[in-house]
Amino acid sequence: MPVVAAVAEALGLPGIGTETAHLMTHKVAMRRQLAEMGVPQPRFAAARTLAEGRLAAETVGFPSVLKPADSGGQRGVFRLDSIDDFDAHLHAAVAESPTGEAIVEGFEEGLELNGLVIARNGEAIPLTLSDRLRPPGIGFGVGWIHVYPATIYGHALEEAERVAIAAVHALGLENGIAFPQLIVSDSGEVTVVEVAARIPGGQMADLARHAVGVDLVEVALRQALGEEIPDELVFPQFRQPLAIRFLTAEPGPLPTGKVQRVGTLDKVLAFPGVVQADVFLQEGETIRPVRLDGDRRGYVIATGDTNLLALERAVAAAGLLDVEVER
């Protein structure tokens, strides 16, 4: 993203700008900017060496999260419950950082939310907030179920929307698509996990299309061409409860092991409420326990009159895919 922003800037083409690109791809710079602008977030500290990292971990406290400063896909992300955990994982985290830097952040308990915000001529337009449910264990950062609309309401929902918008403004995104990830505590306090300036993965573009009738790809293409974006392309056209169930190993429906056979999606797609599904598996591949975003090997999107019904349908349909493995 920083390279694309620099090229666009040099050629006088539409883009998000080099400063914003840096802020939205480098987690330490992002945290410092959010702190300066008063956006709520966890405690954090940067680290390049073991000595700096130990001080950072002790300053932030435990539990905490260790991440590369400039990577993604849950690569090099670890939960820390002690200084021994930090010592064990620092090398792996730094190895995933192109700049050789890591960040330690306070671990926030609560419900994680995925946000979608469209920035248009300096205005931040909130599109969706959805639950991002995560598996237990080492893959705790991987979203394995998305549920729209979010299961919070009232003040907590209003605060989550306010913080998402504030984060986008703080990072200087004037035109583009933003992906703020938030944590909402049991008391309704909202903190920012991070914010990306892109169409997110994890079928979030499909969520926007099926849930609110907005085509993020069209918006992004029009903005890249410098076109004006009319209201009907950026504001929700309807609100349809839905859920996305990713196909993963436990706690998902897939077995672990070397794939021997992958059944068809016919039964999955025929299940009531299912609007889209896909599988990313081939014979000979190995299904591993959930650790990275890439361990999601497919998905099912289902709708319903309520988000709970949509979730029940997505989970049930995902269980209909027949996969045989050699253990």
Region annotations inferred by a language model:
Residues 68-70, 140, 290-295:
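Short, flexible turn/loop "capping" segments at secondary-structure junctions
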Residues 221-327:
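Peripheral (often C-terminal) accessory segments that flank ATP-dependent C-N-forming ligase machineries
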Residues 1-48, 296:
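Conserved N-proximal alpha/beta basic substrate-recognition cap immediately N-terminal to
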Residues 44, 66, 104, 126-129, ...:
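Generic preference for hydrophobic
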